[in-house]
Amino acid sequence: MAPCVHPCQSCRLRALEAFTPVTPQELDFIQAFRNGTTTVAAGGAIIQEQKPNGKLFTLYAGWAFRYKTLQDGRRQILNFLLPGDLVGLQQQFADGAMHGVEAITDVQLCVFARDGLWDLYRAHPSLGYDLTWLAARGEGMVDDNLVTTGRRNAAE
């Protein structure tokens, strides 16, 4: 794994409107929680289905997509991932990934040890709330996609 090439304090993603401000203590925790960075070439696997990897990622640069492989080998794209998206949280609650994640372009990822997630919730509940909000937002988008697929007509 590559060394941390940019400290969290100067992360360009923090300037995006979607990111909430954090305290200096929270920022120090995030920096300590981060193991480093890694890159994945376009077409490469970030997460492989059914294989645990013990890592969480933040997509720092590039594009990726989440997918599910069907029994006959076809793949269903679940959603696209852009810089700032958290990748791999669902693995925390399953034995291995329920979906795969593949790089569309060359990507750079910040890497976090999944086993440190509980420390985050204990030490910084506001950051834990942010992660919970992200998960709930993702669930809402999945619900909306399901309604679109199952019940909405073309005009809707």
Give, region by region, the residue ranges found by the protein language model:
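Cyclic nucleotide-binding regulatory module and flanking cytosolic helices
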Residues: 1-42, 86-87, 92, 123
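Cyclic nucleotide-binding regulatory domains
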Residues: 18, 44-106
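Short, solvent-exposed loop/turn elements at beta->coil junctions and helix N-caps
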Residues: 43-47, 147-150
